[in-house]
A protein has these predicted regions:
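Short helix/turn-capping signatures at newly exposed starts of structured segments
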Residues: 16-129, 133-138, 143-147, 154-219
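Sec-dependent N-terminal signal peptides
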Residues: 4-13
Length: 219
Protein backbone atom coordinates (compact mmCIF):
# COMPACT_ATOMS: atom_id res chain seq x y z
CA UNK A 1 0.00 0.00 0.00
CA UNK A 2 2.85 2.38 0.91
CA UNK A 3 4.54 1.64 -2.43
CA UNK A 4 1.32 2.49 -4.29
CA UNK A 5 0.92 5.79 -2.41
CA UNK A 6 4.57 6.64 -3.05
CA UNK A 7 4.16 5.89 -6.75
CA UNK A 8 1.03 8.06 -6.91
CA UNK A 9 2.90 10.89 -5.20
CA UNK A 10 5.69 10.76 -7.78
CA UNK A 11 3.12 10.66 -10.58
CA UNK A 12 1.27 13.71 -9.25
CA UNK A 13 4.48 15.69 -8.71
CA UNK A 14 5.67 14.75 -12.18
CA UNK A 15 2.38 15.82 -13.73
CA UNK A 16 2.45 19.14 -11.89
CA UNK A 17 6.01 19.79 -13.01
CA UNK A 18 5.10 18.95 -16.58
CA UNK A 19 2.08 21.27 -16.57
CA UNK A 20 4.15 24.07 -15.06
CA UNK A 21 6.77 23.73 -17.79
CA UNK A 22 4.16 23.74 -20.55
CA UNK A 23 2.47 26.87 -19.19
CA UNK A 24 5.65 28.95 -19.07
CA UNK A 25 6.14 31.34 -22.02
CA UNK A 26 8.54 30.10 -24.67
CA UNK A 27 8.59 32.81 -27.37
CA UNK A 28 11.04 35.73 -27.22
CA UNK A 29 9.28 39.07 -27.66
CA UNK A 30 12.58 40.80 -28.41
CA UNK A 31 12.81 38.81 -31.64
CA UNK A 32 9.66 40.57 -32.89
CA UNK A 33 11.25 43.95 -32.24
CA UNK A 34 14.38 42.78 -34.05
CA UNK A 35 12.40 42.18 -37.27
CA UNK A 36 12.95 45.85 -38.04
CA UNK A 37 9.97 46.56 -40.28
CA UNK A 38 6.82 45.08 -41.82
CA UNK A 39 8.80 43.09 -44.38
CA UNK A 40 10.87 41.60 -41.59
CA UNK A 41 7.72 40.52 -39.73
CA UNK A 42 6.34 38.77 -42.80
CA UNK A 43 9.68 37.16 -43.56
CA UNK A 44 9.97 35.72 -40.03
CA UNK A 45 6.36 34.81 -39.23
CA UNK A 46 4.68 34.46 -42.64
CA UNK A 47 2.13 36.65 -44.42
CA UNK A 48 -0.81 34.61 -43.07
CA UNK A 49 0.24 35.37 -39.48
CA UNK A 50 0.57 39.13 -39.91
CA UNK A 51 -2.18 41.77 -40.21
CA UNK A 52 -0.73 45.13 -41.25
CA UNK A 53 -2.14 48.65 -40.82
CA UNK A 54 -5.02 47.83 -38.49
CA UNK A 55 -6.64 49.45 -35.44
CA UNK A 56 -5.42 48.19 -32.07
CA UNK A 57 -7.12 48.98 -28.77
CA UNK A 58 -4.60 49.26 -25.96
CA UNK A 59 -5.70 50.66 -22.62
CA UNK A 60 -7.80 53.75 -23.35
CA UNK A 61 -6.18 54.32 -26.76
CA UNK A 62 -6.90 53.08 -30.28
CA UNK A 63 -3.73 53.05 -32.37
CA UNK A 64 -2.67 51.95 -35.84
CA UNK A 65 -0.21 49.11 -36.12
CA UNK A 66 0.20 45.44 -36.97
CA UNK A 67 -0.93 42.28 -35.21
CA UNK A 68 0.89 38.98 -35.42
CA UNK A 69 -0.87 35.67 -34.78
CA UNK A 70 -4.24 37.40 -34.14
CA UNK A 71 -6.74 35.60 -31.91
CA UNK A 72 -4.18 33.14 -30.53
CA UNK A 73 -1.96 32.85 -27.46
CA UNK A 74 0.84 34.14 -29.71
CA UNK A 75 -0.90 37.43 -30.49
CA UNK A 76 1.33 40.48 -30.15
CA UNK A 77 0.80 44.10 -31.19
CA UNK A 78 3.45 45.84 -33.25
CA UNK A 79 3.77 49.61 -33.72
CA UNK A 80 5.87 51.63 -36.12
CA UNK A 81 7.61 54.98 -36.30
CA UNK A 82 8.65 56.24 -39.71
CA UNK A 83 8.29 52.76 -41.18
CA UNK A 84 10.41 50.98 -38.58
CA UNK A 85 9.17 48.83 -35.69
CA UNK A 86 9.29 51.05 -32.61
CA UNK A 87 7.57 48.91 -30.01
CA UNK A 88 5.95 45.54 -29.42
CA UNK A 89 3.38 44.76 -26.74
CA UNK A 90 1.28 41.97 -25.28
CA UNK A 91 -1.64 42.36 -22.91
CA UNK A 92 -4.07 40.17 -20.99
CA UNK A 93 -3.77 37.46 -18.37
CA UNK A 94 -1.33 35.21 -20.22
CA UNK A 95 0.70 34.84 -23.39
CA UNK A 96 3.39 32.59 -24.87
CA UNK A 97 5.67 35.63 -25.16
CA UNK A 98 8.33 36.71 -22.68
CA UNK A 99 11.01 39.36 -22.86
CA UNK A 100 14.71 38.59 -22.90
CA UNK A 101 14.80 40.15 -19.43
CA UNK A 102 12.34 37.54 -18.13
CA UNK A 103 9.04 39.45 -18.01
CA UNK A 104 5.78 37.77 -19.01
CA UNK A 105 2.06 38.32 -18.47
CA UNK A 106 0.82 37.01 -15.14
CA UNK A 107 4.16 37.53 -13.39
CA UNK A 108 3.63 39.00 -9.92
CA UNK A 109 4.87 42.40 -8.81
CA UNK A 110 7.18 40.79 -6.28
CA UNK A 111 8.77 38.63 -9.00
CA UNK A 112 9.22 41.70 -11.21
CA UNK A 113 10.91 43.40 -8.26
CA UNK A 114 13.38 40.50 -8.11
CA UNK A 115 14.14 40.75 -11.83
CA UNK A 116 14.70 44.50 -11.50
CA UNK A 117 16.94 43.77 -8.50
CA UNK A 118 15.59 46.94 -6.93
CA UNK A 119 12.35 48.55 -5.80
CA UNK A 120 10.55 50.69 -8.40
CA UNK A 121 7.75 53.26 -8.62
CA UNK A 122 4.24 52.80 -10.02
CA UNK A 123 1.22 55.05 -10.50
CA UNK A 124 -1.73 54.78 -8.15
CA UNK A 125 -4.50 52.35 -9.07
CA UNK A 126 -8.10 52.96 -10.13
CA UNK A 127 -7.70 55.27 -13.16
CA UNK A 128 -6.81 55.04 -16.85
CA UNK A 129 -3.06 54.65 -16.27
CA UNK A 130 -3.26 52.99 -12.86
CA UNK A 131 -0.71 50.36 -11.93
CA UNK A 132 1.82 51.49 -14.56
CA UNK A 133 5.53 51.63 -13.84
CA UNK A 134 6.64 55.26 -13.62
CA UNK A 135 10.32 54.59 -12.93
CA UNK A 136 12.51 51.51 -12.56
CA UNK A 137 14.67 53.59 -10.20
CA UNK A 138 17.90 52.56 -11.91
CA UNK A 139 17.19 48.83 -11.66
CA UNK A 140 18.01 46.18 -14.28
CA UNK A 141 14.80 46.91 -16.22
CA UNK A 142 15.57 50.63 -16.55
CA UNK A 143 16.80 50.14 -20.11
CA UNK A 144 19.05 52.41 -22.14
CA UNK A 145 19.09 54.29 -25.43
CA UNK A 146 18.39 51.07 -27.36
CA UNK A 147 15.61 49.41 -25.34
CA UNK A 148 13.04 50.38 -22.72
CA UNK A 149 10.48 48.32 -20.75
CA UNK A 150 6.99 49.73 -20.16
CA UNK A 151 4.64 47.61 -18.06
CA UNK A 152 1.32 47.82 -16.25
CA UNK A 153 -0.03 45.68 -13.44
CA UNK A 154 -3.60 44.55 -12.82
CA UNK A 155 -5.49 47.76 -12.15
CA UNK A 156 -8.08 46.34 -9.75
CA UNK A 157 -8.47 45.82 -6.02
CA UNK A 158 -7.38 42.47 -4.63
CA UNK A 159 -6.40 41.11 -1.20
CA UNK A 160 -7.14 44.44 0.55
CA UNK A 161 -10.25 46.35 1.64
CA UNK A 162 -11.91 49.16 -0.33
CA UNK A 163 -10.65 51.72 2.18
CA UNK A 164 -7.12 50.37 1.92
CA UNK A 165 -7.34 50.38 -1.89
CA UNK A 166 -8.20 54.10 -1.81
CA UNK A 167 -4.90 54.74 -0.05
CA UNK A 168 -2.92 53.46 -3.06
CA UNK A 169 -5.24 54.78 -5.78
CA UNK A 170 -5.43 57.92 -7.88
CA UNK A 171 -3.00 60.12 -9.74
CA UNK A 172 -0.05 59.65 -7.42
CA UNK A 173 3.18 57.68 -7.38
CA UNK A 174 3.97 54.86 -4.98
CA UNK A 175 7.06 52.88 -4.10
CA UNK A 176 6.22 49.20 -4.62
CA UNK A 177 7.57 48.50 -1.15
CA UNK A 178 4.35 50.10 0.20
CA UNK A 179 2.80 47.49 2.51
CA UNK A 180 -0.62 47.57 0.80
CA UNK A 181 0.88 47.20 -2.68
CA UNK A 182 2.96 44.27 -1.45
CA UNK A 183 -0.20 42.73 -0.02
CA UNK A 184 -2.01 43.16 -3.36
CA UNK A 185 0.99 41.81 -5.29
CA UNK A 186 -0.78 42.36 -8.66
CA UNK A 187 0.17 40.51 -11.83
CA UNK A 188 1.53 42.00 -15.04
CA UNK A 189 -1.28 42.71 -17.53
CA UNK A 190 0.60 44.64 -20.20
CA UNK A 191 4.20 44.55 -21.37
CA UNK A 192 5.79 46.76 -23.99
CA UNK A 193 9.38 46.77 -25.17
CA UNK A 194 10.36 49.72 -27.30
CA UNK A 195 13.20 51.46 -29.05
CA UNK A 196 13.24 55.02 -27.68
CA UNK A 197 12.83 57.79 -30.24
CA UNK A 198 12.29 61.55 -30.18
CA UNK A 199 8.70 62.32 -31.27
CA UNK A 200 7.98 65.04 -33.80
CA UNK A 201 6.31 68.26 -32.65
CA UNK A 202 2.91 67.03 -33.83
CA UNK A 203 3.41 63.64 -32.17
CA UNK A 204 4.35 65.43 -28.97
CA UNK A 205 1.13 67.45 -29.05
CA UNK A 206 -0.89 64.26 -29.56
CA UNK A 207 0.81 62.56 -26.62
CA UNK A 208 0.17 65.61 -24.41
CA UNK A 209 -3.54 65.62 -25.32
CA UNK A 210 -3.90 61.92 -24.49
CA UNK A 211 -2.22 62.40 -21.13
CA UNK A 212 -4.37 65.44 -20.34
CA UNK A 213 -7.60 63.65 -21.23
CA UNK A 214 -6.74 60.75 -18.93
CA UNK A 215 -5.99 62.86 -15.85
CA UNK A 216 -8.17 62.55 -12.77
CA UNK A 217 -10.20 65.77 -12.27
CA UNK A 218 -9.08 67.82 -9.27
CA UNK A 219 -11.90 68.07 -6.73
Amino acid sequence: MKKILLLLSFTIVGACSSNSEVSLPTENLNEVLACGDAKGLISKYGAKSVILDTSIVTGDDTLRGAIIFPGTAKQANVFFHEGKISDVSVQGESSVWKTASGLYLGLSLQEVEKINAKNFTISGFGWAHGGSVVSWEGGKLAGDSTLTHLVSFRNKRQNISIEEFKKVSGEAEFDVRHALIQQMNPALEQITILKPYIPTKEEGKGIAKKIESSQIPVR
